[in-house]
UniProtKB/Swiss-Prot annotation:
Belongs to the orthopoxvirus OPG034 family. Induction: Expressed in the early phase of the viral replicative cycle. It comes from the Viruses. Pfam families: Poxv_Bcl-2-like. Keywords: Early protein. This is Protein OPG034.
Length: 214
């Protein structure tokens, strides 16, 4: 298992050579993924940013840093293959879920759901509940889904593409449904990255509480 300090050092290798202006851009981009107060924008350092990323996304910190770097038009490959958590949940654990619990990360749940949709894997009870949002998206966003598909076919990605989802209490679930429809076309990994980019931590937490209450 990779120790946390080793992971921090690996991430720091990508940040240490950034200019001050580039780092400011990185901080601005990080606000989509991390809780940053107004004070953080002027006082946060590269070391503390790395610590925040590792703390918030222990299993996906490499992916988060790679997404953030895209704002600088830099495509980086952060080589961290080993899970930081001592007992990672295997994929089969998600396949048989019948309800959401506090110890399950919503990002893990969404990533596996998108993969099941892309690979046409039978859904368990909890995923069937989530899948109702995909059916709703097919009915409500047929034109918009076509436009998103055209964009992807032209550019090969959906990074920074504006999803046609109104911001309201259903924003997270509707975004999941929309991206689930696209998952077989764009691939579950890119669908998941778009979810991480587009849906804030606050909205994810609200949706997780909603799932846990059902």
């Amino acid at each position: 298992m990779i120790m946390r300090t080793d992971t921090n050092n690996i991430l720091m290798r990508h940040l240490k050579n950034l200019t001050d202006d580039e780092f400011k851009c990185i901080i601005h981009r990080s606000s989509d993924f991390l809780y940053l107060s107004d004070r953080d924008y002027t006082s946060i350092t590269k070391e503390t940013l790395v610590s925040e990323i590792v703390e918030e996304y222990p299993d996906d910190c490499n992916k988060i840093l790679a997404i953030i770097f895209l704002v600088l038009d830099k495509d980086i490959d952060v080589d961290i293959e080993t899970k930081l958590t001592p007992t990672p949940k295997p994929a089969v654990r998600f396949a048989i879920l019948d309800k959401m619990t506090a110890d399950i990360k919503l990002t893990d749940l969404v990533r596996h759901y998108f993969r099941y949709i892309e690979q046409d894997i039978p859904l368990g009870p909890l995923f069937k509940k989530i899948d109702s949002y995909r059916i709703r998206a097919i009915n409500n966003y047929s034109k918009e889904l076509g436009l998103a598909t055209e964009y992807f076919n032209k550019y090969g990605h959906l990074m920074f593409y504006t999803l046609p989802i109104p911001y309201n209490r259903f924003f997270c679930r509707n975004s999941i449904g929309f991206l689930a429809v696209l998952s077989p076309t764009i691939g579950y990994v890119k669908a998941f990255y778009k979810f991480i980019e587009y849906v804030s931590i606050d909205d994810r937490l609200k949706f997780k509480k909603e799932l846990m209450s059902k």
